[in-house]
Amino acid sequence: MANKTILFNKHLESNAKMVDFHGWDMPLNYGSQIEEHNAVRQDAGMFDVSHMTVVDVIGNDACAFLRKLLANDVAKLKVPGKALYGGMLDENAGVIDDLITYYLTDTNYRVVVNSATREKDLAWIAKQSQGFDVTVTERPELAMIAVQGPNAKAKAAAVLSAEQNAAIEGMKPFFGKQAGSLFIATTGYTGEAGYEIIVPEDEAQAMWQALLDQGVKPCGLGARDTLRLEAGMNLYGLDMDETINPLAANMGWTIAWEPSDRDFIGRKALETLRDAGTDKLVGLVMEEKGVLRHDMPVFFTDSAGVEHQGVITSGTFSPTLGYSIAMARVPNSIGDTAEVEMRKKRVAVRVVAPNFVRNGKQAF
């Protein structure tokens, strides 16, 4: 029996096509994935992300524990509400999950992890927390709605109270703040401005309806995937997993090497990999007809005339750009051109940084 979010009936009211997503009944689309995608790029769309796992880490050792658990360093967080993206690694430097951590106080942090990895993550966090003065509490009674797009903040403001709007006024990107019963964060998975709103389950349906009434378009997993890929954001299980280290997943910027005595889990293995050199995650652009897809092989010849092979991790048609884009893991000697094998022939592609669209505009 699949899990259902508190908004399941609201999806049915909007004629959603429901699919199983890692054990959750979730909307794939509400009729047109392209229209939903474009709404987020041009106006405002919203996603039910209540399947995500919210975990509060509280206690005298909360900071010390998270500094060991995560490859990024929560000690960098000094301003209440500031958020940090990073990886949780195993001893071999494989990525157990990527997650966002919000700093509330020195003894209170909120972590949001992926739904597909929930049980694995919670077990790992519980195991690693032994010996630390921390309490790790999952918050299943909280739903989450992501409102994204150039008009998302204005439309969200119309459904928030005066006090809630005052609480989040002027909030910078990548922050979260408690505003009455809501936890409102300037984060997202689309490359657009907006909010991710953590809301008590008993208020979630009314909030969803209020946003609908403001003209915010409901969007499903299909549009969520094309939007995040245009924004060059990783999807766990495709672009990285426990067999992949963060240096090979365009997550090098999320590793806090300093201070050098911070012994986070996976550090020694990661230092060895760093010194030896790893593959890297790049962007591919194909302006010919056709669509780049997961698992297609990528070929290139280096400056010494040696052929190398990589693989596409995520690929799609980009509605914003009008042609296909992909992320691919390849040897780091790649230049600015390559070939992808599709339909038994090789097609030329451009190699770019894995970031295709930001704020509705081409980013490469």
Curated annotation (Swiss-Prot):
Broadest EC class assigned to this enzyme: transferase
Keyword Transferase carried by entry: yes
Biological process terms in GO annotation: glycine decarboxylation via glycine cleavage system
GO CC annotation: cytosol; glycine cleavage complex
Entry keyword set: Aminotransferase, Transferase
Lipid biosynthesis listed as a keyword: no
Catalysed reactions, as listed in the record: N(6)-[(R)-S(8)-aminomethyldihydrolipoyl]-L-lysyl-[protein] + (6S)-5,6,7,8-tetrahydrofolate = N(6)-[(R)-dihydrolipoyl]-L-lysyl-[protein] + (6R)-5,10-methylene-5,6,7,8-tetrahydrofolate + NH4(+)
EC number: 2.1.2.10
InterPro entries tied to this protein: GCS_T (IPR006223), GCS_T_bac (IPR022903), GCST_C (IPR013977), GCV_T_N (IPR006222), GcvT/YgfZ/DmdA (IPR028896), GcvT/YgfZ_C (IPR029043), TrmE/GcvT_dom1 (IPR027266)
Any Pfam family: GCV_T_C
GO MF annotation, one: transaminase activity
Function summary: The glycine cleavage system catalyzes the degradation of glycine.
Family note: Belongs to the GcvT family.
Summary of subunit composition and partner proteins: The glycine cleavage system is composed of four proteins: P, T, L and H.
Name of the protein described by the UniProt record: Aminomethyltransferase
Species whose genome carries this gene: Shewanella baltica (strain OS195)
Lineage, highest ranks first: Bacteria, Pseudomonadati, Pseudomonadota, Gammaproteobacteria, Alteromonadales
Gene behind the chain: gcvT
